């Protein structure tokens, strides 16, 4: 169907939502804008869907949400009556239309006889993950676009273990969603009628209470809050973490917590930040200002759906510096393992899970405590899948999971990255070192002195349109067919191609299988242990380049990182130039 036909179909629909009808009238005559709204269906992929809010098949609106929900409902119905009875838990964040989309999803499922539980107000994504497990539900939905710009919203689907649906199950849901030809013909019953039938239940406080109890269980030294006064500055960046983080810190006894007033309340426009993402250092601007006034020991920031945590601490010059996800992960991991070992509660078969683009310092730390580290593909759903696998087999006992993009999980009562857990543990780690007269920054330098000065970097290259897509393909094809022999003056010794699950030991002309699902990712290791990785985005017209080095000092590792990233990007630029001709 052409975009024009889709547009006409919407325009001629008698009972079209009034707001969307008005939007279409506004766009009348703007061919380009209309084409963008209708030229395709908003894609429902393995991570759910995400897009701009608006009218059309390529936008987030009540009809595209109904379509996704009807597909999920068909998947659940096929599993039988028991699955329908167990039902689906639905949560949402602080974005435009999030409460409406959540209720639309609930109505669509409930109309099909599926029990639904909807939170009474916005909640963090990890609490949704916990609630699925706590209520023994068959699945979960969270309406969020994480830290995308304000004009976006999204929809993520969870399985009965509380983890994001793994690829195999997600593919079946995608099939069901794609089988629906006309999103405008999906009928839903009235909200009140479904509530009267008991098919839509509102949940909230009871889940919060149990979740907070579970949060406090991750503490290794609960007594620290009484022994040390830690000054905390916290910003939820207008999102969902404000109440749960404060509840959790209060339950653990940390009283000296100041919230950034301007960013405390939910705000769909994220008015005070360019991007509500703790990975962006600019997101800490208000927290740093308040931290300086208060002389805070630690600044913590969470993204809108509270699955990512950023922390900032004072460096040796007394200036607040934002730690990378790899650095925060190393501090949390080392604290957990060393303190559990001292208490005799570190299991022999403990395991650390990390993604393939996350720093090797985690493996070095885990190894020093006799623990294995297992790599997964990028995306926390793969970490959740591994936890489930080890839970069933008993091979390993999960200790910690993390990824470089600011996602951490400590207690497996949630199965997605949990910034609430990570925030509580970060404050405890800060208290632990403060008791010894050290800052978190000094603790990090100590870790580097012990394990090596690991340093990582990330660059993104956006190449839009048809030509951009071809250039991204050309970059990967070039590295694949002619792997570089040297980078940054060092020999490339290993090439990993995750698209064919193959590891090639270049110096030995030997091949090994990689036991991970296939993914279009390339990773190269140099003779000095440095590595770099190429990964095209599944949702945007860009390719990400990850770099990692290990040096003898901070300066040395910075220098090595600069040389490696410069060399790789020079090669990439040459490929792009040659395809632009």
Curated annotation (Swiss-Prot):
GO terms for molecular function: magnesium ion binding; phosphoglucomutase activity; phosphopentomutase activity. Mg(2+) binds at residues 146, 303, 305, 307. Its EC number is 5.4.2.2. The active site is at 146 (phosphoserine intermediate). It comes from the Bacteria. PROSITE patterns: PGM_PMM. Binds 1 Mg(2+) ion per subunit. GO terms for biological process: enterobacterial common antigen biosynthetic process; glucose metabolic process; purine ribonucleoside salvage. The keyword Isomerase applies. The keyword RNA-binding does not apply. Its cofactor is Mg(2+). Pathway: Glycolipid metabolism; diglucosyl-diacylglycerol biosynthesis. Belongs to the phosphohexose mutase family. Catalyzes the interconversion between glucose-6-phosphate and alpha-glucose-1-phosphate. This is the first step in the biosynthesis of diglucosyl-diacylglycerol (Glc2-DAG), i.e. the predominant glycolipid found in B.subtilis membrane, which is also used as a membrane anchor for lipoteichoic acid (LTA). Has a role in the biosynthesis of all phosphate-containing envelope polymers, since glucose-1-phosphate is the precursor of UDP-glucose, which serves as a glucosyl donor not only for the biosynthesis of LTA but also for wall teichoic acids (WTAs). Is required for biofilm formation. This is Phosphoglucomutase. It comes from Bacillus subtilis (strain 168). The lineage of its organism: Bacteria, Bacillati, Bacillota, Bacilli, Bacillales. The gene is pgcA.
């Amino acid at each position: 169907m052409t975009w024009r036909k889709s547009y006409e179909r919407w325009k001629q629909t008698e009972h079209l939502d009034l707001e969307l009808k008005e939007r279409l009238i506004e766009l009348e005559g703007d061919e380009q804008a209309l084409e963008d709204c209708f030229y395709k269906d908003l894609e429902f992929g393995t991570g759910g869907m995400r897009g701009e809010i608006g009218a059309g098949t390529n936008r987030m609106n009540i009809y595209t949400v109904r379509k996704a929900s009807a597909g999920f409902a068909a998947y659940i119905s096929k599993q039988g009556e028991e699955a329908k009875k167990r039902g689906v838990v639905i949560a949402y964040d602080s974005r435009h239309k999030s409460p409406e989309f959540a209720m639309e999803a609930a109505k669509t499922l409930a109309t099909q006889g599926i029990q639904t539980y909807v939170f009474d107000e916005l909640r963090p994504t990890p609490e949704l993950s916990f609630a699925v497990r706590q209520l023994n539900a068959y699945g979960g939905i969270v309406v969020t676009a994480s830290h995308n710009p304000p004009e976006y919203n999204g929809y993520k689907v969870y399985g009965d273990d509380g983890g994001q649906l793994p690829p195999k199950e997600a593919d079946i849901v995608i099939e069901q969603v794609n089988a629906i030809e006309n999103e405008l013909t999906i009928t839903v019953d009235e909200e009140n009628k479904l509530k009267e039938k008991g098919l839509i239940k509102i949940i909230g406080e009871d889940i919060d209470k149990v979740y907070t109890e579970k949060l406090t269980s991750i503490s290794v030294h609960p007594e620290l809050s009484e022994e040390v006064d830690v000054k905390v500055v916290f910003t939820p960046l207008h999102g969902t973490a404000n109440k749960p983080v404060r509840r959790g810190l209060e339950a653990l006894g940390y009283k000296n917590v100041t919230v950034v007033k301007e960013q405390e309340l939910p705000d769909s426009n994220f008015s005070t930040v360019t991007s509500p993402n703790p990975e962006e250092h600019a997101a800490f601007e208000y927290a740093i200002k308040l931290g300086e006034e208060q002389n805070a020991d630690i600044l913590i920031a969470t993204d809108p759906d509270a699955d990512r945590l950023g922390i900032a601490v004072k460096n040796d010059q007394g200036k607040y510096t934002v730690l990378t996800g790899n650095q925060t992960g190393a501090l949390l991991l080392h604290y957990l393992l060393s303190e559990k070992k001292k208490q005799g509660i570190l299991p022999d078969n403990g395991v650390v899970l990390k993604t393939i683009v996350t720093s090797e310092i985690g493996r070095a730390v885990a190894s020093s405590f006799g623990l294995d580290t297992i790599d997964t593909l990028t995306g926390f759903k793969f970490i959740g899948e591994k936890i489930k696998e080890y839970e069933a087999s008993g091979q390993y006992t999960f200790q910690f999971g993390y990824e470089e993009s600011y996602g951490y999980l400590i207690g497996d009562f949630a199965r997605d990255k949990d910034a609430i857990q990570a925030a509580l543990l970060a404050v405890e780690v800060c208290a632990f070192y403060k008791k010894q007269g050290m800052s978190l920054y000094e603790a990090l330098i100590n870790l580097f002195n012990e394990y090596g000065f690991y340093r990582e970097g990330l660059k993104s290259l956006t190449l839009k349109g048809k030509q951009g897509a071809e250039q991204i393909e050309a970059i990967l094809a070039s590295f694949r067919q002619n792997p570089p022999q040297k980078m940054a003056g060092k020999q490339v010794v290993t090439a990993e191609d995750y698209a064919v699950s193959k590891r090639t030991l270049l110096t030995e002309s030997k091949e090994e299988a990689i036991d991970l699902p296939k993914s279009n990712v390339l990773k190269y290791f140099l003779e000095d242990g440095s590595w770099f990785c190429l990964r095209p985005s599944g949702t945007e017209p860009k390719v990400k380049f990850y770099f990692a080095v290990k040096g003898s000092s901070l300066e040395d590792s910075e220098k090595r990182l600069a040389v490696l990233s410069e060399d790789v990007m020079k090669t990439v630029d040459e490929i792009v130039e040659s395809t632009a001709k």
